[in-house]
UniProtKB/Swiss-Prot annotation:
Probable component of the Arp2/3 complex in which it may replace ARPC1B. InterPro entries: ARPC1, WD40/YVTN_repeat-like_dom_sf, WD40_repeat_dom_sf, WD40_rpt. Belongs to the WD repeat ARPC1 family. GO terms for molecular function: actin filament binding. Gene3D superfamilies: YVTN repeat-like/Quinoprotein amine dehydrogenase. The lineage of its organism: Eukaryota, Metazoa, Chordata, Craniata, Vertebrata. Keywords: Actin-binding, Cytoplasm, Cytoskeleton, Nucleus, Repeat, WD repeat. It comes from Bos taurus. This is Actin-related protein 2/3 complex subunit 1A. It comes from the Eukaryota. Transmembrane segments: none annotated.
């Protein structure tokens, strides 16, 4: 495991470039900072300043090397690098509330933006007019959209929202997409078609994170009632929900076809297993607890605590986990969702951690990624 303390401020969101030599993150304000790996150090290389509201989402397209950002100013920008300088292009989202989340499609020819306007803007480039335009998916969303993930076929889109529901929509755009083949989620896919809807019948909570598996036939989501759920379209959309004893999870990702990693307010990642019988189980916390050591506080730590915790007391308030506050995002760091070797987390403590499954398997007894 490698932990890097980027900031004293929270990291709102992050995205990696293709070869993982650069990371784009937002320090809980209207800017995006791009850090470059230089030996063992991370050095700030660029600052992207165009938004005038808090940035809420960043995604970095690996093949085309474009960054898309969205924010509370109701705007999205596509950033392209020319001669070492990042240039923004405004995207017309046509929303009257903050944008909350953004995600490139697998083919990078469109992206989706969730918002507080109870809709999803699916944006694509119109070459004859030389600008990015959007189409809206509105019905039957009844509240803020918090999370999105694309199906590998570049057409289906999963969305989690504050109306306690997780939904799968068709985001087929005839201008840029080829006619999609039939999937276990359905065969008719006109734009905006609701393919599946889960949750919200009197129970549940805000859906903070969603993730398709590498095959696209499974969908995982985490809700504010501390549940993890997986729907399997290959088993006639069978849903398995696990009520955990932890604080709510905020982000989720498949790391193999049968394994899911989620993290949130408990400050450490958790591993869950979904077997071929459709049974969802909790496997382990993926953190190696540090032994607390009683020691005198240095002057440096005293000043740091004044800054971070508004206290100069020397009582040890450090958590036993690597992250010292809620984890807000989980992303794949090495390989992909089919066979993840390493994953990355960022959190409210301003830290970024890269987790290595090989190291975790050797230090946590009985742990194996299925």
């Amino acid at each position: 495991m490698s932990l890097h303390q980027f900031l004293l401020e929270p990291i709102t969101c992050h995205a990696w470039n293709r070869d993982r030599t650069q990371i784009a993150l937002s320090p809980n304000n209207h800017e995006v900072h791009i850090y470059k790996k230089n030996g063992g150090q991370w050095v700030k290389a660029h600052e992207l300043k165009e938004h005038n509201g808090h940035i809420t989402g960043i995604d970095w397209a690996p093949k085309s090397d474009r960054i898309v950002t969205c924010g509370a100013d109701r705007n999205a920008y596509v950033w392209s690098q020319k001669d070492g300088v990042w240039k923004p292009t405004l995207v017309i989202l046509r929303i009257n509330r903050a944008a909350t989340f953004v995600k490139w499609s697998p083919l990078e020819n469109k992206f989706a933006v969730g918002s507080g306007a109870r809709l999803i803007s699916v944006c694509y480039f119109e070459s004859e007019n030389d600008w990015w335009v959007s189409k809206h998916i509105k019905k039957p969303i009844r509240s803020t959209v918090l999370s999105l993930d694309w199906h590998p076929n570049n057409v289906l889109l999963a969305a989690g929202s504050c109306d306690f529901k997780c939904r799968v929509f068709s985001a087929y755009i005839k201008e840029v997409d080829e006619k999609p083949a039939s999937t276990p989620w359905g065969s008719k896919m006109p734009f905006g078609q609701l393919m599946s809807e889960f949750g919200g019948s009197g129970t549940g909570g805000w859906v903070h994170g969603v993730s398709f598996s590498a095959s696209g036939s499974r969908l995982a989501w985490v809700s504010h009632d501390s549940t993890v759920s997986v729907a399997d379209a290959s088993k006639s959309v069978q849903v398995s929900t696990l009520k955990t004893e932890f604080l709510p999870l905020l982000s989720v990702s498949f790391v193999s076809e049968n394994s899911v990693v989620a993290a949130g307010h408990d400050c450490c990642p958790m591993l869950f297993n979904y077997d071929d019988r459709g049974c969802l189980t909790f496997v382990s916390k993926l953190d190696i607890p540090k032994q607390s050591i009683q020691r005198n506080m240095s002057a440096m730590e005293r000043f740091r605590n004044m800054d971070k915790r508004a206290t100069t007391e020397d009582r040890n308030t450090a958590l036993e986990t690597l992250h010292q506050n809620s984890i807000t995002q989980v992303s794949i760091y090495e390989v992909d969702k089919q066979d993840c070797r390493k994953f990355c987390t960022t959190g409210i403590d301003g830290a970024m951690t890269i987790w290595d499954f090989k190291t975790l398997e050797s230090s946590i007894q009985g742990l194996r990624i299925m």
